[in-house]
Structure formats: structure tokens, C-alpha cells
Amino acid sequence: MAVVKCKPTSPGRRHVVKVVNPELHKGKPFAPLVEKNSKSGGRNNNGRITTRHIGGGHKQAYRIVDFKRNKDGIPATVERLEYDPNRSANIALVLYKDGERRYILAPKGLKAGDQIQSGVDAAIKAGNTLPMRNIPVGSTVHNVEMKPGKGGQLARSAGTYVQIVARDGAYVTLRLRSGEMRKVEADCRATLGEVGNAEHMLRVLGKAGAARWRGIRPTVRGTAMNPVDHPHGGGEGRNFGKHPVTPWGVQTKGKKTRSNKRTDKFIVRRRSK
């Protein structure tokens, strides 16, 4: 995998930095594991904008990724690595010994021809999935479940991982990349290793059009708006003379937004960011 800085042959190419991976499959995805992915434009079922700055972009097909990794005791061979437009990580097409194919998140170091397995008897190596009570303390894992059988929810983006720092009875303590320390049931599954494609963070789109291809619309500053559109709007010059707020008047610098008191008891230490 190489990080390539483009030559400034035009203003749109001058700042582009690409991540090139020659190991990725260049053909179409595996059709039985692909389904339609309609765009919402950031609107809900009432047609109202619920997420700003979303719209347009290239048509994308959704790849059905196996986050549960619940096919126990059956070894699988990695057929190929693929690009997935729906996530920052790459995915791997694996063929199980019984003939079934599935997509999984591609961990760091995984390549075509490698063997992987799920279940309590799986070996301790990158790409294998086990309950966390069977994974040694100190290991780095990804695609971590928060409820047994629900499927991985933590550490699924490119280059991310979670570290198992302690095991105490029915729970294990995890250290997340944000610095948060959290308890999760020991029967929850996790995949060993860290997610691949860590160089994703080094890419630079280089121009506004590249963001539009990805369905990202412009973000207008509140201070550039009129008073009717934003609390920061209006006035002479650039100073808005108040604490920064969202378009709806909610504090936007440092205000805590967590409101799920039911699961507060599982958070040992809040995130440090």
C-alpha cells in the first residue's frame, strides 16, 4: 500500500493525496452479497432534513458485511480484498469450507489465501473471531460486540482497534481509541487484530468536487448567514459576540451530549478527547 501525492498538473490535482493498494480486487463485487442502497439526501420519512450537508454523490451498492462472525468451527479462506464505498475500511471476501461466501472487515495484514476461523476453539491470530473471555488480556481487537450475538459495533473504521485491559468475572474492560474505558460482557465476540487500511487518514481529497462525489455538500459558517438563518448571523464584520452555538441555539463547544444513564455504570472512565 502506497501513499501517492499527485503532481500539480491542474489546480484540482495540486493538493490530492491518494492511497493506492494494488492488492485490491479490480472487478465487480460478489453479486449475491450486494443490495440496493438508496440515498436519503439527509431527509427522513417526512422529507425534512435531519442531517445537514448530505446530498448527491455517486451511486453506491451496499455490500452485506458479516459483523456477527457466527459461523463457528468452519475454516474459511480469503479469496480477495475489495474496496467498499460505504466505509473507510477495506473488506475481504472469504470462502467457507462448506461453500458459503461472506464479506468481512479486512484486518491489518490479511491477504488472499489466508485462513481464518470463528468460535471458542479458534487460534489467537489476526482475523479470527472469539468470545472475549477466550482472548488474552492485552490483545488488540476490532469489530467488538456490545451485546452477545448482536454483531460488532466498536472499532470498525480503518486503522481502529480496542485493547482488552482486564477481565473480571462476567465482564472485560476495554480501552477505546478515544481513551474511554468501558466494561462489556465477556461473552461478546471480537475479532483479533486491528482494522486494515490505516493510511486512509492520510488521504487528501484536494478539491470540493471530490467531496461532492462522496455525497458531502458544503458547510456554510453561521457567521456568514443572516440573523434569520443562524444565531451567529448578521452584524458588521466577523465577530458575533456570544458563545458559539448550533443553528438551534445549543452550545457547541464542550457541552456534554450523553444522556443514556442506564449504561453509565459500564463506563469506567470517560473519554479523554
UniProtKB/Swiss-Prot annotation:
GO terms for cellular component: cytosol; large ribosomal subunit. The lineage of its organism: Bacteria, Pseudomonadati, Pseudomonadota, Gammaproteobacteria, Enterobacterales. Signal peptide: none annotated. Residues 28-53, 221-273 are annotated as: Disordered. The keyword Heme does not apply. This is Large ribosomal subunit protein uL2. SMART domains: Ribosomal_L2, Ribosomal_L2_C. One of the primary rRNA binding proteins. Required for association of the 30S and 50S subunits to form the 70S ribosome, for tRNA binding and peptide bond formation. It has been suggested to have peptidyltransferase activity; this is somewhat controversial. Makes several contacts with the 16S rRNA in the 70S ribosome. One of its GO terms (molecular function) is structural constituent of ribosome. HAMAP family: Ribosomal_uL2_B. Residues 39-48 have a biased composition (Low complexity). InterPro entries: NA-bd_OB-fold (IPR012340), Rib_uL2_dom2 (IPR014722), Ribosomal_uL2 (IPR002171), Ribosomal_uL2_bac/org-type (IPR005880), Ribosomal_uL2_C (IPR022669), Ribosomal_uL2_CS (IPR022671), Ribosomal_uL2_dom3 (IPR014726), Ribosomal_uL2_RNA-bd_dom (IPR022666). It comes from the Bacteria. GO terms for biological process: cytoplasmic translation. Part of the 50S ribosomal subunit. Forms a bridge to the 30S subunit in the 70S ribosome. Transmembrane segments: none annotated.
